[in-house]
Amino acid sequence: MSPKLAVVTVTYSPGEHLENFLSTLAVATTEKPQVIMADNGSTDGAPEAADAKYEHVRLLRTGGNIGYGGAINRAAAEIDSSIEFVVISNPDVQWAPGSLDELVAAANRWPRAGALGPKVLEPDGSVYPSARTVPDITSGVGHALLGTVWPKNPWTARYRQENEAVTERAVGWLSGSCLLVRRDAFDTISGFDSRYFMYMEDVDFGDRLGKAGWLNVFVPSAVVTHAKGHAAGRHPELMLPAHHRSAYQFQADRHPHWWQAPLRLALRGGLAVRSKIAVASAVRERARTDNSTDNPSVSNHGGK
């Protein structure tokens, strides 16, 4: 029987995460799918080592850091047209046994599912809210402004859907850290929008799938653990502005009319200010953490 699955992951100096990803993938499905690593300029040798070690793993160099969505699109274009499902996953994901087979089984239960996502666990075992509503202007702004200072605010709660029952259901969008995507659905919307260098590309992807008549389905019986931000967390001064630019792009795309120009202007200005505040806070926190690491006598307790 010809394989149903192919796997795409984007690498950027993934370190030991990549080996964990590949070794746990082996017990996540009874198939042995081809894995394409779209490499955006790794310098740690991890993708090359995996390419040499595993016969079913292929290294595809993108020629530079072209962003997450752009790299996914490049790799997807290399997949044989007979493949029914494409797994799109970060390389810092670890699969629970049988989890990918669970996603495929759910896809068979939901023939209009364009994308299906597992329950995503944090490294400490807590559940990450990976199945959410598409943010409108109200919930998006409310979450952006209040999410960190008032986590239980109604806009964040509505957006993150943390109070929803953990059941298999259709949702607005799914975390791009791990997705099973029906190839027909991917092709229908021409994959990811490469204008999103990083962040919000999964929100945009899920929203466009929904508008094209497909469903985004959350499948909590499938479980993965996500290390989260092995590359992004090291450089908040680069990544946080990228996140805010993508948030603006998402809302600007959905409010394109001339009479909405004041709204776009306000969004751009507000997000730019928030980005600067977030970067300053992250840099201070990084310096504090580094100082605590260098000086063990410094207490990590504080009045936050």
Model regions and ranges:
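Short, acidic, metal-binding catalytic loop of nucleotide-sugar glycosyltransferases
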Residues: 23-32
